[in-house]
């Protein structure tokens, strides 16, 4: 907090943006304070069975770019090393660096989808061979909750990037603005894939429920048949 306060004084950052940057979690957003562009991107990584979310707050001015990170840096730390190792990249302007950061944040979304997809497809194969147990059903609902929240994050990030593409903001040049289209397309692709995975989960659950209903129906008919067989000798004995 003291370091952020010193940065606020040095670069004359808006108090509302500083206050927001100190909070560990908040949805993606884009605000303009005078000549300062304030962007919040949501980072994500898969930890065990759950998606862990972080936050990257980015202050972009005409001659500075400041990031405040909450959560694991992951590949973002490597991006900083790459940019610092190549002064020509920094020389392209702060808007180019902002694009590089958002692009790297979004790049981390695809591995999350791929790992969850492997789990879902394995469950789909099991459902074709055998009945899903209670643990499997609980897993389906858990994955559905994780993917639904992930989809909300993707939607908010897509809206943020679309604003950067379509709007006119301080520190974002007309030359760099089209580059954000690539980030927007990347988010849209992951959104579509997550939608498809949610549909697969629903299909797996419905198919499993249908098989279970059929199994119960078969058992019920078998019990009814045995009951009829047992009832016949009883009826004969009573004559």
Where do the protein language model's features map onto the residues?
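Hydrophobic alpha-helical transmembrane segments and their immediately adjacent juxtamembrane loops
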Residues: 12, 185-239
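Peripheral, non-transmembrane regulatory/ligand-interaction domains of membrane transport proteins
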Residues: 1-175, 179-182, 186-196
